[in-house]
């Protein structure tokens, strides 16, 4: 492949929590463990880079600590970040996963939901570039 894999798919911080059951309305349940990891477009970009494909993120990242950590991980994976920093931070996705694998998510929007047309238009596309747009961001 002579071009880059460019993804506009939003990147958010994912907090998966494994639980025994979904709580009733107004109830609560304890999670076995909680951890955090970047999700969304991060996964696709890092997979492309791991296969030797030049990869570039075109999803906004912010100035907050979650954005800082994700930006660092993207760079370590060999992914170029094409968009300017926005003031704020990326959103968070809380995933409740019960014992049979059923998942429910609670999503907060962050700077990843604010891509400006002007910032995207400043990205120079080259022959052979492939632009990935996720339907979930539309």
Q: Where do the PLM segments sit?
A:
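Ribokinase/PfkB-type carbohydrate-kinase core domain
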Residues: 1-11, 60, 72-85, 97-138
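Short, basic and Ser/Thr-rich N-terminal targeting/leader segments
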Residues: 38, 51, 77, 88-90
